[in-house]
Amino acid sequence: IGAILFERTMDGTAGGKPVPAALLDKGVVPFIKIDKGLEAEENGVQLMKPMPELDALLARSKALGVFGTKERSVINSANGAGIAAAVAQQFEVGRQVLAHGMMPILEPEVNIKSETRAECDAILLEEMLKNLEGMDQQVMLKLSLPVQPGTFDALVDHPKVLRVVALSGGYKRPEACVELSKNRGIIASFSRALLEDLRHQMSQDEFDAALGEAIDQIHRGSTQKA
């Protein structure tokens, strides 16, 4: 199990310990979100904004025991040049992360509302495979669930990919879990879908039951494949 933290969460404490150390004590692997948001759309994609202080953040994160990073860009339409640029940027940042001895999760998200999703998936796969050939270390990938189940099998099987995880990307949890179950070797990295049924006014028992049900459903989608 892993947890992706915001920078301010990483810098906080839990039970008198830094949050990353507290997570590690419970067997949870900490990652940090490093991107600073998205640029305006160009060529059908939104690249990541510049991260001029990234090396300093990575050094601090590593010292706190953080295992890896996550960085998100968005693909809105099937523009070959745009998708190539988004993937190239992801790998460029990934190499910077690897240089600090950390594991990057590359996240070129395909917008599930795109009218050209299937074409986006195909171009993304081609560009990912092309860039992976130039890698001498493993990376992780966080991808939108594809239109055609099994589209990303070649990434799941690639020797330079440690793990492929899926984002829920706007799907409601039941639908996200059904789509996840159709894709072998891919596990969930859901946030919105995990938390969607939780409410502030719930009692502790209600909260625990709702969260437990969500975890069980997501676990089934990750492990019981159609």
Task: Name every feature range the model reports, one short phrase each.
Residues T69, S73-K142:
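Eukaryote-skewed repeat-based solenoidal scaffolds used as protein-protein interaction platforms
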Residues I1-F67, I75-S77, E127-L143, V147-A226:
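Alpha/beta catalytic barrel-like cores
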